[in-house]
């Protein structure tokens, strides 16, 4: 630094000093990580299509993180894919969300879609399908169009002959590519936060979240 040059020049006046500034390499960008949480063995989740889209995306600086909630451990032997099996603590689940960048869901139907909702309240970009309950909770430009398809066999509460969503695979790949190419790592989900917040839930139970209530001891609280 110029400071060091001045100090050394005073200390060693017969020498000439030159400043060559320190080179600090630019930190490499961390990999863009897609992630999914759920029972990936359930045909309704269409997890195989998420894997296919990830492979076809074919970007070396991407990762796919999977929290599998299945009856048995699952292995996915593909490069850049990590599977976490078994039950994990709330802390570890929060760390999983922290590690990842974009939540990917491709279900034919969801009552809610808790993985996607939990990602949304953390303001992650979220990809969901436009069938089932998830679009009620999450407003995202990455909402995949769905047709309808008839079930060929029973699937838990869904019976053969019923219909559920037939999500557009090309749109899934398009949204994943857009999120990666534009480095989308944040998305404001105000709608989700309001809908799932304490005040909103209290109102749905007919309670006024701002009024004073009494606890079991008879003491007044607010």
State what each model feature region is.
Residues 1-6, 13-26:
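Donor nucleotide-sugar binding/catalytic pocket of nucleotide-sugar-dependent glycosyltransferases
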Residues 163-171, 180-209:
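A charged, aromatic-enriched C-terminal amphipathic alpha-helix characteristic of glycosyltransferases
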């Amino acid at each position: 630094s110029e400071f060091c040059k001045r100090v050394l020049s005073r200390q060693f006046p017969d020498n000439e000093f030159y400043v060559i500034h320190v080179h600090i390499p630019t930190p490499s960008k961390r990999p863009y990580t897609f992630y999914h949480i759920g029972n990936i063995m359930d045909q309704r989740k269409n997890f195989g299509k998420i894997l296919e889209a990830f492979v076809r995306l074919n970007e070396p600086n991407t990762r796919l993180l999977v929290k599998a909630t299945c009856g048995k451990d699952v292995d996915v032997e593909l490069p850049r894919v990590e599977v976490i099996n078994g039950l994990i603590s709330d802390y570890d689940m929060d760390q999983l969300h922290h590690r990842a960048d974009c939540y990917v869901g491709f279900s034919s139907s969801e009552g809610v879609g808790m993985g996607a909702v939990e990602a949304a309240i953390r303001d992650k970009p979220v990809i969901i399908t436009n069938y089932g309950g998830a679009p009620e909770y999450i407003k995202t430009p990455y909402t995949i169009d769905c047709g309808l398809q008839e079930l060929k066999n029973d699937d838990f509460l869904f019976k053969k002959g019923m219909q559920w969503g037939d999500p557009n695979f090309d749109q899934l790949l398009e949204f994943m590519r857009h999120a990666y190419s534009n480095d989308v790592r944040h998305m404001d989900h105000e709608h989700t936060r309001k809908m799932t917040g304490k005040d909103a839930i209290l109102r749905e139970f007919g309670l006024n979240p701002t009024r004073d209530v009494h606890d079991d001891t008879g003491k007044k609280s607010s």
